[in-house]
UniProtKB/Swiss-Prot annotation:
Fe cation binds at residues 226, 228, 291. Its cofactor is Fe(2+). Residues 25-37 have a biased composition (Basic residues). One of its GO terms (molecular function) is histone H3K4me/H3K4me2/H3K4me3 demethylase activity. Its EC number is 1.14.11.-, 1.14.11.27. This is Bifunctional lysine-specific demethylase and histidyl-hydroxylase NO66. The keyword Cell wall biogenesis/degradation does not apply. It comes from Dictyostelium discoideum (Social amoeba). Residues 7-17 have a biased composition (Acidic residues). It catalyses: N(6),N(6)-dimethyl-L-lysyl(36)-[histone H3] + 2 2-oxoglutarate + 2 O2 = L-lysyl(36)-[histone H3] + 2 formaldehyde + 2 succinate + 2 CO2. Residues 180-327 form the JmjC domain. One of its GO terms (biological process) is negative regulation of DNA-templated transcription. GO terms for cellular component: nucleolus; nucleus. Pfam families: JmjC_2, RIOX1_C_WH.
Length: 514
């Protein structure tokens, strides 16, 4: 793998398209590719503002009409094929309605909770039920700890009671009848409805989306108070559950990078918000909000927690940018490779930090400042963004194809499609690919991913192309969701046009108009 992504992806396919095509004597023009240029820092040293930073707007302020889509209708409406990005927006809009998406991002996301009361209208009906849970256990090899937890919260202590081995239905229901909560980990692996929901929402958020399902008997609590490192949407599927939310204990726990340990009641104080969710209701709260939940004494609770924005922060992006900037500096700047002075340990370090007026210490700290200035001239922001996008793709769920998408792609072809210049095609999913241009053109995709989190297929989803193909690939990506002719691809060589489309077809990335 070429520089910039070599630390992210260790094993790549060796497949390369359009390398040794016969040009029939035609002389090709040399392809000129604009590479990402490092962006310099505006200050020589990091500056910390005394004013609080305002949250970055995640969507434009302009309010647009978005059709609301029920989660039971994912993949079975006209938007599923017309433009899956619009469908994804519609699914989120349906979840948070009557709040509109622009207001959600402006007022709630990453800031405070949102409670949506449906007044008894269970819009999630039949999405996932107790019977669905039972069938999942019976039809799949699910294991305790890996796929299923049985827990209880007794005398202010969480207790996990997982046996070893397979989670047989009889064992799970035995623990449930004894007052334990049942947690299904990554149910999208085994249930298509949950897979469709998570896969669709990851299209909207453009980062990983996961889920857990919780079944709690009447009058029980399965987990101690804690906060998570993800933003969560609680969808109450059956029964009722009382939720208590508590403010972060200090500023360092606002939007945390890691989940907390279990808290005692004394550590969290009184809740600032308490609500009982009924079937059809929704509750959103950001990462860092301390929470606990208990089912009423007269009814069980079944809910799904949909989570997102794990390790998807400015800090994560800047970390990748700085790491790559340091690699570049070590490669290109002699000063970064020079040895440290023998006496640096006598002047640098916490025990020497109070030697403010020491000339030798000042000389050494000034040197660090000079190197920081040079590092600031080498910030490869676009490479860092590519690394973030590629990591998301390799961790993401594969797309759930509609019947029409299967019918018009390699997924359902009994015989291989013969691609011609007049063939019209388009990407199946625009957000399922990422084009990275370095010494070659690399198209990453998630079509080969499995439904198990962090597990890709036998090989990561990668197709390599020559630089002559870059404009064609950009044209294909930018044209989505419109169909385009193979003959109209911006490549001089006609055979190479066919090669590009064939490569995408064989990887299951495109569908044909007819």
């Amino acid at each position: 793998m070429k520089r910039g992504l070599e630390e992210e992806i260790e094993e790549m396919s060796e497949e390369e398209v359009g390398v040794n095509n016969n040009n029939n004597g035609k002389k090709k023009k040399k392809k000129v590719v604009k590479k990402s240029k490092p962006v310099p820092l505006t200050k020589s040293v990091p500056q910390v503002s005394s004013q609080p930073l305002r949250p970055t707007k995640l969507v434009p302020k302009k309010k647009t009409e978005i059709r609301e889509i029920n989660i039971n209708d994912i993949g079975s409406n006209e938007l599923s094929v017309a433009d899956q990005r619009v469908e994804a927006d519609g699914v989120l809009a349906g979840l948070i309605s009557p709040t509109i998406i622009e207001d959600f991002y402006d007022q709630y996301f990453g800031q405070k909770h949102l409670y949506v009361k449906r007044n008894g209208d269970n819009i999630y009906k039949n999405f996932f039920t107790k019977d669905s849970l039972d069938k999942m256990l019976r039809n799949n090899l699910m294991k305790f700890t890996e796929n299923v937890d049985v827990t209880n919260y007794v005398d202010f202590q969480r207790i996990t009671l997982n046996p070893e081995g397979r989670a047989y239905p009889s064992l799970v229901w035995k623990h449930y009848k004894e007052g334990c909560s049942v947690r299904l980990l990554n149910p999208q692996t085994f249930n298509s409805n949950v897979w469709k929901l998570c896969s669709t929402l990851q299209t909207h958020f453009q980062c990983g989306v996961g889920a857990n399902i919780y079944l709690t008997p009447a009058g029980a609590q399965g987990f101690a108070p804690h906060y998570d490192d993800v933003d969560v949407f609680i969808l109450q599927l059956e029964g009722k559950k009382e939720w208590r939310l508590y403010k972060p204990r200090d500023a360092n726990e606002v939007l945390p990078k890691k989940s907390s340990e279990n808290f005692t009641q004394e550590e969290i104080g009184e809740p600032y918000f308490t609500v009982t969710l009924e079937a059809g209701d929704l509750l959103y709260f950001p990462r860092g909000v301390i929470h606990q939940a208990v089912s009423p004494s007269d009814v069980h609770s079944l809910h799904i927690t949909v989570s997102t924005y794990l390790n998807n922060t400015w800090g994560d992006l800047i970390g990748k940018v700085l790491n790559r900037a340091l690699e570049i500096a070590n490669e290109e700047c002699l000063e970064f490779r020079e040895g440290l002075p023998r006496d640096y340990t006598q002047y640098l370090g916490v025990i020497h930090s109070d030697k403010v007026g020491d000339e030798r210490r000042k000389e050494l700290t000034d040197k660090v400042g000079t190197l920081w200035d040079k590092l600031g001239q080498l910030l490869p922001i676009d490479i860092g963004a590519d690394q973030m996008a590629v990591k998301y793709l390799l961790d993401s769920l594969p797309p759930v194809l509609t019947q029409l998408e299967k019918k018009h792609s390699i997924e359902d072809e009994t015989t291989s499609m013969k691609i011609k210049p007049e063939t019209r095609f388009r990407l199946i999913r625009a957000d399922s690919v990422r084009l990275v241009v370095e010494d070659i053109a690399i198209l990453f995709h998630n079509a080969d991913n499995t439904r198990i989190y962090h597990q890709v297929g036998e090989e990561p989803g990668v197709v390599e192309f020559t630089l002559e193909c870059v404009d064609a690939l950009e044209h294909i990506i930018d044209s989505y969701p419109s169909y385009i002719y193979t003959k109209d691809l911006p490549i001089e060589d006609d055979d190479q046009k066919l090669d590009v489309v064939s490569a995408l077809y064989e990887k299951g990335l495109i569908m044909f108009e007819k």
